[in-house]
Amino acid sequence: MRISLLAGSAVTVLILAGCSSTSDEEPARVFATPDGPGLSAAVTEDALVGHLQELEAIAAAHDGNRAAGTAGYDASVDYVVSQLESAGFEVTTPEFEFETFEAQTQTLSLAGTEIPVFALSYSPTTPAEGITARVVGAPAGADGCETADYAGLDLAGAVAVVPRGVCPFGAKQTVAAELGAAATIIVNNEPGPLDSGTLGDPETAKIPTGGVSQEDGAAVLAAPEVTLTLVTTTDTTTSRNIIAQTTTGSTENVVVAGAHLDSVPEGPGINDNGTGTSAVLETALQMGSAPEVTNAVRFAFWGAEEDGLVGSTKYVEGLSDDDKRNIALYLNFDMIGSHNAGYLAYDGDDSDKVGEPAGPAGSDAIERTFVERLAADGVAADGTDFDGRSDYGPFIEVGIPAGGVFSGADENKTAEQAAKWGGTADQTFDENYHTDQDTLANVDRAALAKNGAAVAYGIGVYAQSVEGPNGVPVGAAREAARAEG
């Protein structure tokens, strides 16, 4: 059994069931005071790094990754479950199915020249020799979201070329397919490749669809004919979430704290998202399964986040109306130790006026909790948009307030941010994002420690109260707020 000793702070001692009075008995497990200050002091950098070392070793033993549906992910589940059970939690690992997509061949040729193209997830496959057809571009100013955008044009058997934006990729290829197009090429609407994107699901996908850069889009449109080859496969895979809840605290104001456990297939996923996993896990271990808290805390470790937030979406979809009503808030932790780290709190009040609107009522208060905690640690946090790229998405969708901290992914750090946080301006927060270099060696340990303490603090604060200046709607106010949403 693992023993945690917290010097200089109040602790709660739980003698685990089954201990005897003999000299062979297991020693008492020591838990932290289950509030913001107590938990933030107890969640140490060394403990977080210890979990990351275990996850990295798991990846190394399983083809270098911990992706959903693989043995590496299953071993990661086993590790987290064993840790939680050692702290007395009753743990469930509900299974779910999801579709996995892989592109074996991705080529686009015009006049003998190869142009980089990337298959959008769930794109149907072309014949092995590809599709050779004339090019028909959406008229200038048209976005390809409606059949009227192609008025007067003959798409039958053609490769439709449309700009990114306005409507989902799936809608663009559906419109082109309805007009008889053989394939679709979507051109990025900003510099750089269009190397990720999805058609939604296999049922939505109608015709082979790839993405090209803004720079290459002009050449494609100017070509009379192109050959597109996308050899792809879509398979049904099973994965699991991990759920563990305290036996104490109100079940009418549940605090859900989550992190996705899976990596991408390309690497071990130690920052993304071993760091978030380690912080949520260590907070659970320090809190224990029966802490003296006002509100129950539900710890969640999501599967298949990298495949489209699948685990968290399946979980929320499976909740009854009462289940959703009884969740006071959701705290999300996805990447907290980026190599060129930022200190970001989800912009619950939309004060930054960037991207998506404010989160559900109470999200502004959650943002304040984390901003204030980081400020107490000498860090002036910035906001980060609820852009739908992590597991808060399904919770926000049903009106549950959300928040958390984040150290940045593929966005660039600004000069102003580098001046106040250190690091390198005009470079991405994590150049190792979704690569085989997402390793412990490339985790910013100072950011891991500060953000890890903030994770524990936020969970502890709301475990004790979801009301007050930084509280969220409760009772009738919650009903009203979610009805309006």
Predicted regions and their residues:
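Noncatalytic luminal/extracellular "stalk/propeptide" segments of secretory-pathway proteins
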Residues: 25, 34, 41, 45, ...
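His/Asp/Glu-rich mid-to-C-terminal helical/loop segments that flank catalytic regions of hydrolases
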Residues: 412-481
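Catalytic-core environment of secreted peptidases
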Residues: 45-63, 70-71, 81-87, 159, ...
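Bacterial signal peptide processing site
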Residues: 20-22
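Extracellular/luminal Protease-associated
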Residues: 70, 116-212, 268, 381
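Metal-dependent peptidase/peptidase-like ectodomains
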Residues: 43, 265, 292, 302-413
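Soluble metallo-hydrolase cores and metallopeptidase-like ectodomains found primarily
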Residues: 121-145, 201-270, 282-285, 289, ...
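C-terminal motif of bacterial Sec signal peptides marking the signal peptidase cleavage site
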Residues: 15-18
